[in-house]
Amino acid sequence: MKGMLRMGLVAVAALAAACAPRERTLVLLSTNDMHAKIQNVPRLPSAVEACRDTARLVVLVDAGDRWTGNAYVDMAPTPGMPMIALMNELGYDVATLGNHEFDHGQAFLGRMIDSMAFEVVCANVTSDTCTFPQLPPYVVLDKDGIRIGFVGVVTNYEGPGHPAGNESSFAGLEFPDPQAMALKYAAELRPECDVLVLVSHMGDDRDRELLAGGASQYDVVIGGHTHEEVDTLIGGTLLTQTGKDLRNIGVTTIRMKGRKVAGVDFRLVSLA
């Protein structure tokens, strides 16, 4: 009788373990403000591949300003293309726009977006021109059943009303308030996503303002624009930024229990 009882308890324990939420780890690799610093690229592929070798669920993300800052890239036959070719080769998944994406005008940027083999999202730029594509505000990726929403925003504070740059680069474009758009799409996506990420080129000061309001609903903010190294938790949201010039790559580890976020942490890996 006791033997049967022990066997029953073992069976119950095994069943409970089998029914328990599965624990998985999702890794977001992030860059921002690379500014064409292709001289710092050699260590990037090895860092990305090392992560992919050890983690099964990896997403590669960029928060804007991919060119303007290195003559080899900026004076190439197609300015900026060496960086885009590298990003395509590495298998980037998602990116948003930075202010320097507009440096060569809308038609040029439209062609560059067409050449990008990854999703480009920006929730606060609308276009009524035929030279610039209407970008999606977000994308939802599925990684092993985990639904990850990425919303993109770009600064409109320096223009004012648009990113810093030549006025002619922004004709026919409107840049609604990025914080308002970030909140709007967070509310829309949160019910259908297990993980929600804001890919922001507002600057960490504006990111902090957004999170301090307590209504963001994001799990992680991958930031850019202000060239800072940022790793802080605000109201339950992890705010990150990797600095500039491809000196670092950000590694955000999201621990999942079932389809819920159980914890997040961040570290920088030096590439310089």
Model-derived regions: residue spans:
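Acidic, metal/ion-coordinating pockets
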Residues: C19-L271
